[in-house]
């Protein structure tokens, strides 16, 4: 895919501005919707070889807690590639370390990451609160009206502001279709969103960018 993207970007007036990679260095516990079942160590030989071969990669998402992920983020940053934390369950100290290593953005904020929680009788901040506490960190939200309720969209807008919040569709290939359908039997389209067939998780939106802008203006503005 990276090689194909590289070639497409060479074409005159190419609509492709760059490649965004999500995975494979993701926490399996938090990446069920991507069907990642094993721990994938961020192998310098593998990611350096790819980044030396192509120049189209603009962003790469990973879970900071995966083996080798912090060095991975440092390398991405040195290469001018945005390192984004995703599908993670890290708490404040680890988020601080991740930010220092180069993870300056949070992918599909609130989704595939925990918020405030308890372990036995004690309470702990989640990834969400940790990202809020690091002021320079940017976030993106899937504002399709399904992935996050209006109250959370308003909270993100209030705490991160317009300069540090962006919208992302995180959409499936059938987005925008009059009758969206998928061939993968593990997935279903229901209530205007894509879900795992067992209803244990959302998988992605079927919204277009204008839908997201409309939702933010009407519900979070």
Q: Language-model segments: which ranges?
A:
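Glycine-rich beta-alpha junction loops
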Residues: 23-25, 110-114, 143-147, 169-175
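A generic structural motif
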Residues: 17, 88-90, 166-172
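Divalent-metal coordination cores built from histidine and acidic residues
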Residues: 1-56
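Catalytic cores of large soluble enzymes that bind and process phosphate-bearing ligands
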Residues: 39-42, 144-148, 201-208
